[in-house]
Amino acid sequence: MTNERKEVSEAPVNFGANLGLMLDLYDDFLQDPSSVPEDLQVLFSTIKNDDSIVPSLKSTSSQNSDGTIKRVMRLIDNIRQYGHLKADIYPVNPPKRKHVPKLEIEDFDLDQQTLEGISAGIVSDHFADIYDNAYEAILRMEKRYKGPIAFEYTHINNNTERGWLKRRIETPYKVTLNNNEKRALFKQLAYVEGFEKYLHKNFVGAKRFSIEGVDALVPMLQRTITIAAKEGIKNIQIGMAHRGRLNVLTHVLEKPYEMMISEFMHTDPMKFLPEDGSLQLTAGWTGDVKYHLGGIKTTDSYGTMQRIALANNPSHLEIVAPVVEGRTRAAQDDTQRAGAPTTDHHKAMPIIIHGDGAYPGQGINFETMNLGNLKGYSTGGSLHIITNNRIGFTTEPIDARSTTYSTDVAKGYDVPIFHVNADDVEATIEAIDIAMEFRKEFHKDVVIDLVGYRRFGHNEMDEPSITNPVPYQNIRKNDSVEYVFGKKLVNEGVISEDEMHSFIEQVQKELRQAHDKINKADKMDNPDMEKPAELALPLQADEQSFTFDHLKEINDALLTYPDGFNILKKLNKVLKKRHEPFNKEDGLVDWAQAEQLAFATILQDGTPIRLTGQDSERGTFSHRHAVLHDEQTGETYTPLHHVPNQKATFDIHNSPLSEAAVVGFEYGYNVENKKSFNIWEAQYGDFANMSQMIFDNFLFSSRSKWGERSGLTLFLPHAYEGQGPEHSSARLERFLQLAAENNCTVVNLSSSSNYFHLLRAQAASLDSEQMRPLVVMSPKSLLRNKTVAKPIDEFTSGGFEPILTESYQADKVTKVILATGKMFIDLKEALAKNPDESVLLVAIERLYPFPEEEIETLLAQLPNLEEVSWVQEEPKNQGAWLYVYPYVKVLVADKYDLSYHGRIQRAAPAEGDGEIHKLVQNKIIENALKNN
């Protein structure tokens, strides 16, 4: 590996933040070379003898003797670092800055005459051939750094990136738009503004979350997509909240005006869906508000055929960011091959649009940005655009953040930040150009802060002057960017005044024509909102059978390693035991081996697998060992990359210490590539609630709201084992509360073979109408439990079973105990010590959909049954009890007694003391097995 950070010898020329210090050290060196470190002695000796470092030093020795050069360089340094504080980036209501660093020539006891006597090369080496002297160069820098784009990049640690940005920003450049392009740009703005005005006039008070004040967002997106087309990027993934969303849908994804206006009129918009199939819009049966909806457009409008997707989004601001990143990575990965996927960052790019209040306020943004350079998550650079209207509902910046800009928090991720005046549309285009060039060069994120305002209230029913009267006095006086740019083109002679007004009127005419096509009487009235017939049934078992030899061949391959690969002896001993199910009569397949065999057969079927989570390569409980490490060299080997007849990729990554962003990423990946078996594994199930927004707003409701299918699988370690309230419960009750309309499968298993068949069933459902999320309350101590491990013949045939029982004599059973997961195993082991034929244990393997028919059939076979008990280790107000009670109550009816055994109602999930845990657990088991 190479270290991207440059040696200190490059610091004085390129490290703006350290320039003052380096100059002081250089002065010390001139007085006494031994007073500075040896590496700086070498550097300063080079400067002293080589004009290429500071080209003008020799010719300015007289000025340098009185500190002139040092003052010049400090002025330059300040302009680069702090010029943004005086930049012309505010269309209205510029902030009053306090304590602005020195940025003027006179602040450094300099003047025009002095600067004209100094070479331009002292300002920057690339200025030497452009400007006659330092004065001209500094004027250029002042104009550049204090203009309509404010640049922040001196915080970036990478020397090459910072140097590239400095040259790109300071080299004379202007967006060159010919007259036709300027006219086209004005038309874009006319459509953007005209659309909002039409809706405002014709649907008074209707919520639309207008784009007005940051209208330039649309041409910025159009410019971005056009550049991407030229670079061969054919998949664009966009994520944004509600502000300006309707405008982006109509003018970037080309959603017809008729469809949009239909939604305001509550008529059926799908009647106006383009018949050529170029626009894909899915809908759920309960639906969502119009400003949450997304779509996919296939178009050549931007220069080549591209697929442009705007992700569906809830009102939870910013939560869509990791979803978009995941969708992008899925579009970049080639998964239809053996081994690991190959990733091509030129296939797709993400654009994420943020709000200025939500960007620094929501932690999901920083979880997501942290993924940017990680092997398992990088998308080759995201374009972040902040639609900065400088207010959040009623909250002004002084109450919204502790930093100068909403973007300051992005500095920790070593990305450039450009603030641009939203009313200077040509400057916004230039900002996009530089951002896209940087992304292409370095495959890193860029943040553009589009500084504008909000024309109306948070929504169009809100009166902003109640809480923000002074800013809105000025906002109401501010002309729209459409008008500002139009007048500029009139003054330049690009268009006439009549043409400007004609463009504006044409937009209104087109909107009126679209409006007139809609039949007001054609109202949508479907109160039943039934789910699709495909979801009437639970996840179907995969009945494919395997020969003993087939599974043995797979197992042998998984336990074969490259010559010279040195596995830790302790681990090698554990792995060798995985041969036993195939060469010993009493050999059993434990949980981890069952998973490996399932994964291998799924890969042979052509379904790619992607598994991520904290410590997932090894497994939190040291059970999986999917990635092996050579104990001498540290090199890695992944056996699931070498499965015989493998037709798809296996991708596994240890995730960063994040839940929300990582789960959102995997959800997005699976939505984009529905053939991919995506699995997120929590370190402990207790930590899954950090992803609750993803669960609530995407995973469990996306199909109902948006018609968006997902088959994401969650592995959530869950069991009460005396480890305290934060390492016991995956909050099973919350997933069961979210379960409805066959929107998911929730299981808590007690058998390794059932786990094998479950994984295969889930994989088989992918990319079908039956696909749905799978939630596995995965084991901890049961990973190595011999009661859970099963012989190989349970793997060669059969399928997933929603309930499991042991053999029993029907007429002797008087009590049925229903339990799940580890509770079932604890009961089974206790009953084995004191057998009682009157008690029948039933493992409820699948909790949702609840196996009513299977239980009803079982109970009907027991003529002397008197009591049915539900036993769980969770408190009564948690776990599955409150969910299963209505089902079991119906099954029991008046025929049998119904009882509950488990912890009493508790605020916390579990006891903190391990010994107390044992007492409580044993008491539950003892009471449950009593036969009254």
Curated annotation (Swiss-Prot):
TM region positions: none
Q: What class of enzyme is it?
A: oxidoreductase
Cofactor(s) recorded in Swiss-Prot or TrEMBL: thiamine diphosphate
Q: Which UniProt keywords apply?
A: Glycolysis, Oxidoreductase, Thiamine pyrophosphate
- Could you tell me what reaction this enzyme catalyses? N(6)-[(R)-lipoyl]-L-lysyl-[protein] + 2-oxoglutarate + H(+) = N(6)-[(R)-S(8)-succinyldihydrolipoyl]-L-lysyl-[protein] + CO2
Any one GO biological process: tricarboxylic acid cycle
Q: What's the EC number here? A: 1.2.4.2
On whether Oxidoreductase is a keyword of this UniProt record, the answer is: yes
An example of a Pfam family matching this protein is Transket_pyr
Q: Which Gene3D superfamilies match?
A: 3.40.50.12470, 3.40.50.970, Multifunctional 2-oxoglutarate metabolism enzyme, C-terminal domain, TPP helical domain
Is Oxidoreductase among the key words of this record?
A: yes
SUPFAM superfamilies assigned to the protein according to its UniProt record, in alphabetical order: Thiamin diphosphate-binding fold (THDP-binding)
MF (Gene Ontology): oxoglutarate dehydrogenase (succinyl-transferring) activity; thiamine pyrophosphate binding
Q: Which NCBIfam families match?
A: 2oxo_dh_E1, PRK09404.1, PRK12270.1
Function recorded in the entry: E1 component of the 2-oxoglutarate dehydrogenase (OGDH) complex which catalyzes the decarboxylation of 2-oxoglutarate, the first step in the conversion of 2-oxoglutarate to succinyl-CoA and CO(2).
Q: Which family does it belong to?
A: Belongs to the alpha-ketoglutarate dehydrogenase family.
What protein am I looking at? 2-oxoglutarate dehydrogenase E1 component
Protein's organism: Staphylococcus aureus (strain bovine RF122 / ET3-1)
